[in-house]
Amino acid sequence: MHIVSIGCNNERMEKMKKLIISIVGIVLTCCVTAQQDIRKPGLPLEERAQMILDMLTLDEKLGMMEHRNPAVERLGIPAYSWWNEALHGVARNGFATVYPMPTALAATFDDKSVQEMFGMVADEARMKYFRSQRAGQYDDYAGLTFFTPNINIFRDPRWGRGMETYGEDPYLTARMGTACVNGLQQQVNGYYKAMACIKHFAVHSGPEADRHSFDAVVSGRALWTTYLPAFKYIVKHTDVGMVMCGYNRLNGVPCCTNEHLLVDILQNLWGYNGLFVTDCWALNDCWERDTVIPRHETHATAAAAAAAAFGSVVDLECGSGLPALKEAVEQGLIPISMIDAHVLKILKARLSLGMLEPEQPFNTIPDTTLFEKKALEMAQKSIVLLQNKDNILPLQPEKYKSIAIIGPNAADSAMLCGNYNGTPYHAVTLYEGVLKYVNTLPENQRPQIYFDTACHHVDGHYRLPRDFDKQIADCDLVIFVGGLSPELEGEELKVEMEGFHGGDRTSINLPRIQEDMLKRIKKMGKPIVFVLCSGGAVALDWEDENLDALLAAWYGGQAAGTAVADVLFGKINPSGKLPVTFYSTKNYIPPFDNYEMEHRTYRFMTEEPLYPFGYGLSYTDFRYSDFSFDAGQQLFYCRITNTGKRDGDEVAQLYMTNKNDDRGPVKTLVGFERVHIPAGETVVVTFAVDSEFFHTYIDEYQRFEKRSGFFLFRCGDQEMEIYL
């Protein structure tokens, strides 16, 4: 009996083994078949996305709604992080090309070059993505979906993150943001190179220290005429892949749970159908009770906040709210059909980037020398010549036996890179740029260079060598490189010192220690060229009156030093224009937390600023003439002649005043075109003005209406009044 029993057990075990092997084989076959199915590039994108969705479990679906998507190995879907940065080059992902910050890019008024630049950013991103995939690395910052551009309005010069934006004007911001989106989202053979995200929707521009609890209270007029136009323009003119909602509240409601903002306006009115993503951990501000950081506290629980966001149109959370999302689903606060709709959009986005193809698209290595050339070109075009007394610039090296280069930003390579940046292989500081240029000159024309930082940006005392005064006295010219630093202004910084708080500025003046140093040098009777590095406007009243030349060089990226030297010595004719107003210390600026637009920016200022929006000098002169309007084609024309002796670029700017709107802007930019004009030659610039500029906002009805009346147009020193 015992022997028979063993034999029967062996027989059963053998059958069981065969059954298990058979089941495993079937499962493996199904998995392989499923993987083959989702990797069929011939199927329509929508069909493939739906097929994958149908294979997912609920937990797998929910996992895709957090920015760190876990892998679904049984279907061959790799892990992926949606959080990647490319504000002015691929960021936080090792060595990469660092282009100028967005305020500097805006100063070029060259959206064509900005689009080319972001096309190169997409190329570099693909290169890095391909390498990460090969290495099995799926961390944050290694992907293709970029939380850029920042198209908030730089409404106040004190905002620390203003340097991430394209300035204070809605139309300039819209054009530059469009260039960024189209550059990143180049489409080849049906696949996007990368995906852009316009942020922060909406009405988001400080204060940084209070951003997790701040309520931006704005009128309908300010909302619709200043804060929303750039978003609307990009949604209407591009296929932008993502929109990010901001941390702040808008008129009492957190942006990421704001149905009026996200559903009524963005989705229903404008027809946006891309992905909605939260700012990182923004939903936590809705429910967390924090004794250290004040928060909105608008929802009782994390699940309630998740339901308010995902139960509406938010598809993806940058954060760690998966448990709350799951709880909201289990409580019946979010229907499964809505989860399916969100995940379907997420899958379509990944498929549109070619992420699930057997062979990754765009896997060839581009010519990276083009990236370096473009970084230099953009830095050169961004520099704004603010003052040039007695045409001291361009410098003639043979006139100077020795030149002193001093100031806290003279040899600071980190400053050049701004924030949200990559690590350049080599950043040329302004000191290095000047030294390098001088060393190319014949020995008999080569001035000696003396260098010292001389002072800090803000705090501390002078740390001068004993022979500092003698060295300056022996020099024929001083180049002072000062201004601000991303260590002082930026996103939610832990900075508390004179003139700075939490990443924002409390004063628009140049830090006192730098002005004191300039006054000390001025007393020595030396000509001074001041190179300002900053993310935005600085009040330079004393400097404008007392110094010989002023340049705004922004945070100019890895090639800033070379670009500044090229402008100082005349290799490049400066052509940048201010994307922000440079206020005088005499100008009134409303309280920082007031989001209404009266007295703000060139559009609503009635006082004279120190340097106006759109201002910038050149080493040549331009004459405007024959300003005309073709009523049939609705086009404006203007002739521009280079009357100087040097070739140069000019930015023709068209401004409009709506005389039917008593509360409207004093003037507003409605067109611009950057043109190259050789010495002595003339070009004709053509402007096509968007018809929406001819609509008047009616406060009584909280909407725009087309009302006939007079409109004043200006281009250079030319103007005309038209009845439309």
Predicted regions and their residues:
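Glycoside hydrolase catalytic-domain context in secreted enzymes
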Residues: 31-696, 700-721
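Bacterial Sec-dependent N-terminal signal peptides
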Residues: 1-36
